[in-house]
């Protein structure tokens, strides 16, 4: 992830505009490849609320086993869909408080895990190579990494804040790397602590393992606090994710990327894209038939595809500008070797996703290619622009009109 984060950081210097992977690939490689990246990003957005609702339902099912999982899933979907239709937004200060609460929950989890291990197995048990080696060898670790990469996603979204940031060519690259590093440290620390307590590879309910472990190390009271904190975070995240994808669909409908009659309409009463919100809720019902690992893999397919092309866009930028004045200071090690490693790792992890994710992802890409051919009249005209950043009225900030972003 750090190799890929470095590529995002590098491209944000050369293209200090909002748009992230879509913009980088379009400008450095090709507008049609940029469209494909935007298409895969749409898959991520469509499945993100589903994954969030599914994880929340898994925690609640573990806490209340007598209540079927589908009840929690439907409750999440109906509640967030209704709130998004009326246009409820969570204030920035509330988001900050919720984020701080989740950090507190994770910090307490690690603390209780350390106390548990020392009390039951001695201080020496805190140092173990098992969390990094596992029982199934490198192949099993790689397969797990292909799913765990979901926990590192987010650094790529920093570049969408470019136009709102002071001195973006200096601060955005630093922020991208910092988010990747901090997210990585938090994930590795919590995962290490959890694996010390639960070193096995077979569990009664893998989806609620963290909550079950919280009960083991801290008792029922801490488990309730742990689940409560995570559920609040899951609920607000699901609310934001559903709002984001519905507004993304609206922007794409408004710009002619998707059928305007359905996707490009706002409610006269609430000024929200009701059809898109309901569609997202209906897609979320797929959580009734999926587990966390499989649904997360769907998101990672789109992420790994975009990551690979962003890494290649760095190499493309180097090849295009190496003989120009702008490319006089470009270092082949940082513009070829580093992104090439990132691309190879991303492709390798992509191949480690489960077959269902690969099949869905390949089908989605095939649909995107066919749709691109239709929109461009057989590649004879440029693909339409995708608006992937927020504004104050529709949730997406509009830039100058262009054939592509």
Where do the model's predicted regions map?
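Helix-loop-helix junctions that connect adjacent transmembrane segments
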Residues: 68, 97-227
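Helix-loop-helix connectors at the membrane interface of multi-pass transporters/channels
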Residues: 26, 52-73, 105, 162-169, ...
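C-terminal membrane-solvent junction of multi-pass transporters and transport-like membrane proteins
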Residues: 94, 261-271, 307-357, 381, ...
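TM-loop-TM module centered on a large, flexible mid-protein loop between adjacent transmembrane helices
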Residues: 23, 30, 62, 175-241, ...
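A generic transmembrane alpha-helix motif of multi-pass inner-membrane proteins
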Residues: 302-303, 333-405
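Membrane-interface loop-to-helix entry segments
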Residues: 69-122, 176-181, 299-309, 334, ...
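Alpha-helical transmembrane segments of multipass membrane proteins
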Residues: 59, 81-85, 110, 191-192, ...
């Amino acid at each position: 992830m750090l190799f890929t984060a470095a590529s995002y950081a590098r491209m944000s210097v050369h293209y200090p505009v909002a748009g992230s992977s879509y913009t980088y690939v379009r400008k450095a490689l090709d507008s049609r490849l940029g469209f494909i990246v935007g298409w895969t990003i749409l898959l991520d957005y469509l499945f993100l609320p589903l994954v969030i609702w599914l994880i929340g339902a898994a925690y609640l099912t573990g806490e209340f086993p007598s209540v079927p999982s589908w009840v929690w899933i439907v409750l999440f979907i109906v509640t967030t869909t209704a709130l998004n239709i009326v246009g409820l937004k969570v204030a920035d200060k509330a988001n900050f408080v919720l984020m701080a609460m989740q950090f507190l929950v994770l910090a307490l989890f690690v603390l209780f895990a350390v106390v548990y291990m020392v009390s039951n197995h001695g201080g020496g048990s805190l140092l173990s190579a098992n969390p990094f080696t596992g029982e199934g060898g490198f192949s099993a670790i790689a397969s797990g990494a292909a799913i765990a990469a979901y926990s590192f996603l987010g650094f790529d979204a920093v570049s969408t804040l470019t136009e709102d940031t002071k001195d973006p060519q200096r601060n955005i690259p630093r922020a991208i790397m910092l988010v990747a590093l901090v997210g990585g440290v938090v994930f590795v620390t919590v995962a290490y602590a959890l694996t010390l307590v639960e070193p096995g590879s077979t569990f009664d309910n893998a989806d609620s393992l963290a909550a079950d472990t919280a009960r083991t190390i801290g008792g029922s009271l801490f488990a309730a606090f742990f689940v409560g904190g995570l559920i609040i975070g899951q609920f607000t995240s699901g609310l934001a994710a559903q709002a984001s994808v519905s507004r993304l669909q609206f922007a794409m409908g408004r710009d002619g990327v998707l059928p305007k009659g359905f996707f490009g309409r706002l409610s006269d009463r609430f000024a929200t894209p009701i059809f898109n919100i309901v569609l997202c809720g209906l897609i979320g019902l797929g959580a009734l038939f999926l587990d966390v690992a499989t649904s997360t893999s769907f998101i990672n397919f789109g992420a790994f595809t975009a990551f690979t092309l962003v890494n290649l866009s760095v190499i493309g930028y180097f090849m295009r500008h190496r003989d120009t004045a702008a490319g006089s200071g470009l270092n082949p090690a940082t513009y070829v070797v580093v992104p090439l490693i990132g691309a190879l790792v991303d492709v390798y992890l992509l191949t480690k996703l489960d077959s269902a994710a690969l099949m869905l992802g390949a089908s989605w890409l095939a649909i995107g290619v066919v749709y691109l051919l239709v929109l461009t009249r057989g590649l004879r005209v440029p693909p339409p622009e995708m608006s992937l950043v927020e504004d104050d009225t529709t949730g997406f900030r509009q830039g100058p009109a262009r054939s592509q972003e």
